[in-house]
Amino acid sequence: MSTKAELACVYASLILVDDDVAVTGEKINTILKAANVEVEPYWPGLFAKALEGINVKDLITNIGSGVGAAPAGGAAPAAAAAAPAAESKKEEKKKEEESDQSDDDMGFGLFD
């Protein structure tokens, strides 16, 4: 039951955030009653308290970027670390191309 209650409260919270309405326990409970979903009385208040002071829209937007709520200073080292990774990918592609050529030289082609 608690998994369904948690999910229902999450959806109700997302509905409120999408409509730019403050997330409170009463409003979550109102949406749950309108949807005919029964949850234990402490769930709506718990979710409202957990989301208090959090900008949920920014959180959802940043999930795709992989940064999350990291401070702005933390982004520079991540970008610097990405450069060597890109170089290693280029090296892997070169090695892969070389290995493809070596297979051709051996005469084991599919249609030879």
Curated annotation (Swiss-Prot):
Disulfide-bonded cysteine pairs: these are none
| Biological process according to GO | cytoplasmic translation; translational elongation
Q: Where is the composition biased (Basic and acidic residues)?
A: 87-97
Per the record's keyword annotation, is Ribonucleoprotein included, yes or no?
yes
One annotated GO molecular function: ribonucleoprotein complex binding
Q: Where is this region: Disordered?
A: 80-112
UniProt KW Ion transport keyword: no
What is the protein's known function?
Answer: Plays an important role in the elongation step of protein synthesis.
Note the PANTHER family from the entry. Answer: 60S ACIDIC RIBOSOMAL PROTEIN P1 (PTHR45696), LARGE RIBOSOMAL SUBUNIT PROTEIN P1 (PTHR45696:SF10)
**Which named protein is this?**
Large ribosomal subunit protein P1
Which species?
A: Drosophila melanogaster (Fruit fly)
Q: Which gene encodes it?
A: RpLP1
